[in-house]
Amino acid sequence: MALVPVGMAPRQMRVNRCIFASIVSFDACITYKSPCSPDAYHDDGWFICNNHLIKRFKMSKMVLPIFDEDDNQFKMTIARHLVGNKERGIKRILIPSATNYQDVFNLNSMMQAEQLIFHLIYNNENAVNTICDNLKYTEGFTSNTQRVIHSVYATTKSILDTTNPNTFCSRVSRDELRFFDVTNARALRGGAGDQLFNNYSGFLQNLIRRAVAPEYLQIDTEELRFRNCATCIIDETGLVASVPDGPELYNPIRSSDIMRSQPNRLQIRNVLKFEGDTRELDRTLSGYEEYPTYVPLFLGYQIINSENNFLRNDFIPRANPNATLGGGAVAGPAPGVAGEAGGGIAV
């Protein structure tokens, strides 16, 4: 979870910031344009448009509003997952790990340009070189294909460098304490979930930080409790849309959440459907606000020190951009605050 930046100026050049925007066919006879949604031109810090987030990572962008005592509203980034409560196994994985991403994404069914982007995201140099070696034997490689490959590679690497916290003047924030495993969070030590999080590339770490909000957020001595339980976990398979204990949360998937990119494909769905005359009940309750039944992603524990000016655009480079979990960039929780509630703080 992160603060939504102010955005770009009206006169600023419109730039597609989605990492999948450069997808093209390596076959000169095929014309293809990546179907990005309009938010791809928003400087929101996701570096992926909502269309591709839904299609590839089974998540959809949202905002989490936070109000202060004067009713001022600050919107934080968060995502809701699009995994039904009846789904099991590999279908519940939102962001897979480096060991299983090719199977989870079914990479062999994608265009080579999209495969190349995923391999770059997961730092799989061997797979990247394999694609290049295979394309060298295609017709028109030197006259056309090589130029297209370099364009896709350069555009993707530019975004990956932007989301790498170790890059000079990186635009991603790393100056807050954030835990994705609350087991040792009260002692300001990371757990297994945090170690697994650190194995991800900078792009995927930024994506998780944007998509997953904390159960608890502590700003100095002020503690905000958003949820009393996690709605996702990070394990060896990746970021998974599963609760730590008990049955999965009810999460109905609307028809608008389904990407219908394959109209000729037969898909069988077992859905819950109500029948009968409900108009009278609808009229009685129509004046009340509806409670959303979808499941936003909450996990862990986050601590922010007000000296870091949390409420500013977090794309502005910090004094210590390389501060990571357990580092000395921020102060620990005040006595009697971090140990009172039963959860943690994270983003």
From Swiss-Prot:
Record's keyword terms, sorted: Capsid protein, Late protein, Virion
GO CC, any one term: virion component
Taxonomic superkingdom: Viruses
Subcellular location, record wording: Virion
Family to which the UniProt record says this protein belongs: Belongs to the baculoviridae major capsid protein family.
Note: Expressed late in infection.
Name of protein: Major capsid protein
Organism: Autographa californica nuclear polyhedrosis virus
Gene: P39
